[in-house]
C-alpha cells in the first residue's frame, strides 16, 4: 500500500511540475509512514512540508494542490490535510478486504519482492573448528539463517556459505598433542576437553609449541599424514556443528561448508594479482595495501596486510579470495556477511581493496551485517560460573529442560512424549526468538525467565497465539482453507487486524533489505495482539449470521497462515496445541 501511495504522490508531483506549480529537477525521497492515530487515516506523508520552500508556498497550500492533483485509486477512500501540512491517506476497506481475499487464495500469501530478484550469498555461522560451538556462534547462525529464509521466500536465489575456521595454528597444536597421546575415537569426539588439554601443553611447553608450529608448516605443505589427521579433526568438528544446526532448525548443511582451507590454493594468486594492479606496498617485509581513507590515531594510513614478512597469509587474504570466488564463480549480485560488528573496520577495508583490485563485478553489493554480543545478567559476555565459554548445545539442553518443567506444570495430564515434543519446540524457539527479536546491532542480556514467559514479545506468547487460531478451526473440525465467501471489514478490530495483515509483504521486504529479523518479530507480535483484540470483540463461532462467521473465519485463517509463515521464516517450529 505504501508503494501505491508513493506512486500516486509521484504522479501528482509530475503534474504540478507540468503546471508550473513546482520547479523542475526536484527528486524528493517520498516518505510514507503508518499513521499513529487511525482516526486521522492509515498512512501519512510529509511531502508538502518537504517541498514547500522550493515551491515558495505554505505547506498547507501546497498540500491542497497535491490533493487536487492526486489520481484517483480504488485503494484510497479519501485524503485529508492534518497539522502543518501532512497528507493523511485513508484505505478503502472494501479494496483492503479484496486484497486479503486474494492473499488467502494464494499459496504465497500474495507476497512479492520489491524490485528484481537476485543471487545472494549469505555468509553465516562460521565457527572455528577443533572446538565445539559456543553461545557466541548463536547470533551469526540464526540471524543469517532467518534473513536467508526471507530472501528465499521473496524469490531470490540464496547460496549459504559457512566460512568455517578449518585452518591455522590450532591444528598444529592438536596434531602435536595427538602424537604425544594417541586418542580413541571416543576421546577425540570430546573435542572441548581434547582441545583444552592440547592448549595447556602449548602454553606450558616451548618445545611442544615449537613442534606444533612445525606441524602447521607440514600441514600447509600437504604432508599426507598431517592432512589425514586434520581431516579427521575437521570431520568430527563438522558433525558436532551439524548436530547443533539441526537442533536449532537452521537450514545449514555440510554442502554449505566453504571453509578457509578451500581458498588456500588461491592465496598466492590474490597477492600476485594485487601486486599486478599496483596496490601492494612492502612495509617491514610485509605485503600491504594502504587506503588513504583508513587512518591510524596519529593520522597515518592504516595498512591492510595480506602477507606477513615470513610469507604467511592473513584473514584479509582469505576474505579477498572468498570475495573473488563469490563474484566470479557463484555470480553473486549481493553478499551478506553476518559477522560480529567488532569486525566492521576489517570488512570496510577488505571490501574496498576488493573493489579497487577488480575482484567484484560492477553492481555487486558487499554488506557487513554486524551484530552485538549476547551478555549475561551482569552485562558482560555470557560465561559459565567458572568463567568458561558456554557450549551452545548445553544452552539448548537447559532451555528444553526449563520449558519441559514449565509445560508440565501447566499441562500435567499430557502424555510424556507430547510434553517432550512441546518442550523442545518451546525451549529452542524461546532461545532463538529472544535473540532474533532484538535489533542485531544491539547487545542483549540473556534471561531464561523472560524468554520463557507467556507474556510479552516472546516465542511462547507467539506460539500460543498461533494455537488459539488453530483451536478455532479444530473446534469446527475444518482446515484453514475451508472458509468460503468474502471478507467484510465492519468492526474496528476487523479493520485494524486487516490493515496489519496487508503489511506482511512490506515487512518481509524490509527484513530482506536491511538484514533485520527483529522487524518481522515486531510485526508478528503486533499481529498476535491485534488478533487477540479481534477474537475477544468479534465472536467467530457465535457470529450473528453465516456470512459474518465466514468473513471472520477467513480473517482468522489468514492470521494463522501469516503467523505460521512468519515463524517458519524465523526458523521457529509452530504447534497445533500447547
Swiss-Prot record:
Motif 'HIGH' region, residue numbers: 127-137
GO molecular function: arginine-tRNA ligase activity; ATP binding
Keyword Chaperone belongs to the record: no
InterPro entries: aa-tRNA-synth_I_CS, Arg-tRNA-ligase, Arg-tRNA-synth_N, Arg-tRNA-synth_N_sf, ArgRS_core, DALR_anticod-bd, Rossmann-like_a/b/a_fold, tRNAsynth_Ia_anticodon-bd
Quaternary data: Monomer.
PANTHER family named in the record: ARGININE--TRNA LIGASE, CYTOPLASMIC, ARGINYL-TRNA SYNTHETASE
Record-stated family: Belongs to the class-I aminoacyl-tRNA synthetase family.
Protein name: Arginine--tRNA ligase
UniProt source species: Pseudomonas savastanoi pv. phaseolicola (strain 1448A / Race 6)
Lineage, uppermost ranks: Bacteria, Pseudomonadati, Pseudomonadota, Gammaproteobacteria, Pseudomonadales
Gene that produces this protein: argS
Amino acid at each position: 500500500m505504501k508503494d501505491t501511495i508513493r506512486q500516486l504522490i509521484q504522479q501528482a508531483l509530475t503534474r504540478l511540475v507540468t503546471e508550473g506549480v513546482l520547479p523542475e529537477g526536484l527528486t524528493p525521497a517520498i516518505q510514507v509512514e503508518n499513521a499513529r492515530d487511525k482516526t486521522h487515516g492509515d498512512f501519512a506523508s510529509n511531502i508538502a512540508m518537504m517541498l514547500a520552500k522550493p515551491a515558495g508556498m505554505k505547506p498547507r497550500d501546497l498540500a491542497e494542490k497535491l490533493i487536487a492533483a492526486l489520481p484517483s485509486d480504488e485503494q484510497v477512500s479519501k485524503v485529508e490535510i492534518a497539522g502543518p501540512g501532512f497528507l493523511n491517506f485513508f484505505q478503502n476497506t472494501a479494496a483492503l478486504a479484496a486484497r486479503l481475499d486474494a492473499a488467502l487464495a494464494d499459496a504465497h500469501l500474495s507476497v512479492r519482492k520489491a524490485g528484481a530478484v537476485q543471487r545472494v550469498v549469505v555468509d553465516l555461522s562460521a565457527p572455528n573448528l577443533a572446538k565445539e560451538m559456543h553461545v557466541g556462534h548463536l547470533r551469526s547462525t540464526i540471524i543469517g539463517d532467518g534473513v536467508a529464509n526471507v530472501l528465499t521466500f521473496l524469490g531470490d536465489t540464496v547460496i549459504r556459505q559457512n566460512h568455517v575456521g578449518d585452518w591455522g595454528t590450532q591444528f598444529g597444536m592438536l596434531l602435536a598433542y595427538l602424537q604425544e597421546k594417541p586418542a580413541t575415537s571416543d576421546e577425540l569426539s570430546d573435542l572441548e576437553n581434547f582441545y583444552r588439554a592440547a592448549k595447556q601443553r602449548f602454553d606450558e611447553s616451548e618445545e611442544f609449541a615449537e613442534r606444533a608450529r612445525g606441524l602447521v608448516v607440514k600441514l600447509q605443505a600437504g604432508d599426507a599424514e598431517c592432512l589425514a589427521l586434520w581431516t579427521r579433526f575437521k570431520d568430527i568438528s563438522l558433525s558436532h556443528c551439524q548436530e547443533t544446526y539441526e537442533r536449532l532448525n537452521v537450514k545449514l548443511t555440510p554442502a554449505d561448508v566453504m571453509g578457509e582451507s578451500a581458498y588456500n590454493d588461491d592465496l598466492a594468486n590474490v597477492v600476485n594479482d594485487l601486486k599486478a594492479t599496483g596496490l601492494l606496498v612492502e612495509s617491514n617485509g610485509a605485503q600491504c595495501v594502504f587506503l588513504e581513507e583508513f587512518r591510524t590515531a596519529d593520522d597515518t594510513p592504516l595498512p591492510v596486510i595480506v602477507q606477513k614478512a615470513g610469507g604467511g597469509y592473513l584473514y584479509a587474504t582469505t576474505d579477498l579470495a572468498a570475495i573473488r570466488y563469490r563474484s566470479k564463480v557463484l555470480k553473486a549480485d549481493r553478499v551478506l556477511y553476518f559477522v560480529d560488528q567488532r569486525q566492521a573496520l576489517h570488512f570496510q577495508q577488505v571490501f574496498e581493496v576488493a573493489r579497487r583490485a577488480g575482484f567484484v563485478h560492477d553492481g555487486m553489493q558487499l554488506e557487513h551485517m554486524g551484530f552485538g554480543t549476547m551478555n549475561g545478567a551482569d552485562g558482560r559476555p555470557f560465561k559459565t560460573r567458572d568463567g568458561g565459554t558456554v557450549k551452545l548445545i548445553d544452552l539448548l539442553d537447559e532451555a528444553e529442560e526449563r520449558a519441559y518443567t514449565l509445560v508440565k506444570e501447566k499441562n500435567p495430564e499430557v502424555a510424556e512424549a507430547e510434553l517432550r515434543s512441546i518442550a523442545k519446540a518451546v525451549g529452542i524457539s524461546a532461545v532463538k526468538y529472544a535473540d532474533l527479536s532484538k535489533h542485531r546491532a544491539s547487545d542483549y542480556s540473556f534471561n531464561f525467565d523472560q524468554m520463557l514467559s507467556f507474556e510479552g514479545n516472546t516465542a511462547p506468547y507467539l506460539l500460543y497465539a498461533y494455537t488459539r487460531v488453530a483451536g478455532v478451526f479444530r473446534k469446527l473440525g475444518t482446515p484453514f482453507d475451508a472458509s468460503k465467501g468474502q471478507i467484510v471489514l465492519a468492526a474496528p478490530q476487523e479493520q485494524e487486524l486487516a490493515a496489519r495483515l496487508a503489511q506482511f509483504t512490506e515487512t518481509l521486504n524490509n527484513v530482506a533489505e536491511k538484514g533485520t529479523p527483529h522487524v518481522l518479530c515486531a510485526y508478528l507480535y503486533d499481529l498476535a495482539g491485534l488478533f487477540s483484540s479481534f477474537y475477544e470483540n468479534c465472536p467467530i463461532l457465535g457470529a450473528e449470521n453465516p456470512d459474518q462467521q465466514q468473513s471472520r473465519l477467513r480473517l482468522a485463517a489468514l492470521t494463522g497462515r501469516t503467523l505460521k509463515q512468519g515463524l517458519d521464516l524465523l526458523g521457529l517450529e509452530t504447534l497445533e496445541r500447547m
